[in-house]
Every structure is written in C-alpha cells, then in structure tokens.
C-alpha cells in the first residue's frame, strides 16, 4: 500500500489496514501514494496521496485522509497563530487582541474594551505570551479522523481532530 513514495529524515508509519469510503461510494485503502515525507509521523490507517510537493515536520493522527494537496509543512519554530495581534473595533483605534487557541469571548471583550485597566491588560498579555512560547514548536500536528482534500499550501498550522479542509 506504499507506491511512488519518498522518505527523508525520520519517518514513522502506522499500520495500513483500513479502507475509507468517500462520497459517491468510492473505497480507498489506507496507504501512501505519490507523496514525499520528511520528518513525519503517520498514525494508523491513514491515506495520503497526490501531494504535489511534500509534507515536512508533522505528526499525523490516526484514520486521516489527505489527498491532492500542494504542500504541508512547518518550516521554523512557530506558535501556530498564538500571540498574534488582531485589530478589533477599528473605528475606536488601538484595540488589539492577542489571539490564542484558548481565547474566550469574555477575554477578548476585556482585552478590547478595558484599556482603562492597564495593569489587567498587561497581565493578560503576559499570560498569552507565556502560553504562546510554551506551545511553540518546530513540529505541527494533524489530528485523528481529519480529511484534507484539494488544498493548496498549509504552513505552520495545527489541525485538530475531526477537521475537514476542502479547497
């Protein structure tokens, strides 16, 4: 179940025992076809095929289906979007919110509208900076039961379980 595949760096493969049933009733066996993997861990029963360039520096979960993608890579130490400033309430000016993957609506509200409490805002920013640095990595992750189809470039992204990305 491995055809026309190149490996470099450290690559770990899980078992390839299952089949995927796609919309329309087409069945594909798990495996690797037309793909280059560099420093990748592939979980059990994944189907990865027709990757135009390569997949580099990722841990791919179990039962994941990836097909017709240009490139998937982490190319440096990244925080995966944590700690990035997003400007909100543009009409009021100076209302940046540091986003993170645990951000709640309540936290965003406080960060945007409680500028008159600079001690609170500075402490919340410090917590976000700490969280961002703690979760920074040179290896990305694609969760279990993920489907990625017909997509261009995916760079420096953490993809959670059961996510569907269709281009």
Enumerate the language-model features and the residues they cover:
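Domain-scale signature associated with acetyltransferase and cell-envelope carbohydrate enzymes
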Residues: 1-167
């Amino acid at each position: 179940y491995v055809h026309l595949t190149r490996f470099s760096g450290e690559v770990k493969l899980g078992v390839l025992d299952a089949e995927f049933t796609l919309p329309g009733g087409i069945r594909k066996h798990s495996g690797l076809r037309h793909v280059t993997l560099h420093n990748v861990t592939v979980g059990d029963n994944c189907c990865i095929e027709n990757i135009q360039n390569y997949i580099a520096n990722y841990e791919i979960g179990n039962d994941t289906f990836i097909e017709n993608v240009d490139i998937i890579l982490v190319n440096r130490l990244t925080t995966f979007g944590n700690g990035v400033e997003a400007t909100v309430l543009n009409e009021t000016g100076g209302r940046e919110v540091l986003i993170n993957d645990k951000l709640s609506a309540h936290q965003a509200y406080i960060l945007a509208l409680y500028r008159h409490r600079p001690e609170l805002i500075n402490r919340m920013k410090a917590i976000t900076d700490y969280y961002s640095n703690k979760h920074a990595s040179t290896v990305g992750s694609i969760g279990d039961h993920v489907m990625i189809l017909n997509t261009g470039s995916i760079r420096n992204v953490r993809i959670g379980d059961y996510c569907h990305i269709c281009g």
